């Protein structure tokens, strides 16, 4: 049975010192298990002194407050992650026990064309690679006419959903990446009239301001640039959480309605959370493979960290946390069903995001199936989140 710790308020300096001295004395007498941390600051001191191992075990739980709700965190690792600040080398990793109450979009469908300079009113056309979704890609070339200019820094979108004929979709023009009201919406016809904008492919042609067609339809699986990463590390109120990270970026579905994940969190809890150095694979379709490195307060776990193995050979996105490897139903890291990976939202097992991309796609992201098996989901879908962080 795991232990659960909840802190109501901060201690005075004298109380902190008395508690710390009692911990030290008890540990010397091998009685550490009889004591509990009494505050977030006290817990941080125990982590930094490497005494937390005597008191807190893997799967023990901590409770903290976010606005009017209590969030329960599991201890999933100790001294497992690398603090971003080199003056510290000790850490204790926490992850939400259940999913956050609201499912979140990883990243929104993106613009297909970026207007580096003003795009005058007139007729244009673009091609979608004939080998891509040939069932619904039913024009050899898509022609449209703008009656109003698009300013420099503006975008064109083509919101082509799944299992829909592309010929039925309208081109939307926007004055900027943050604008949510189109300048105009115009129908497409088959034709090659006017100026050619180029060919949309899965790889994209970023240098010529053309996005990957997969990201145009389903959003981006690049975690470093993702909307969900911004949400996780924001303490801002709704409407102020998201800003464009690329020239093709578009506002996520929650941009105007969701406070940042850190918004309303217990200040004493936030004071002990340090930035963690994390590694994320890049897809091999339009991001060139390899990996990105970043330092974040809150982060999603990689598929490897939840005991599912590597997405890309040679890219190590962290190591399996003891919580996932030690309590797994599986005898070795694998992608099959695992009850230890199941997480609930609203009392029901639900999908939840990893940060790892599905490497063979520009838009799909690894996720955990309600059975605990490996899955993937399109970035634009709202899926559960179970963030992690480190007391450092």
PLM region spans:
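Short, low-complexity N-terminal tether/leader segments at secretion or assembly junctions of large
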Residues: 1-20
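Solvent-exposed serine/threonine-rich low-complexity stretches and specific carbohydrate-binding patches
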Residues: 141-149
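Collagenous Gly-X-Y triple-helix signature in extracellular proteins
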Residues: 18-114, 120, 150-151, 155-392
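A short tyrosine-centered beta-strand micro-motif
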Residues: 124-126
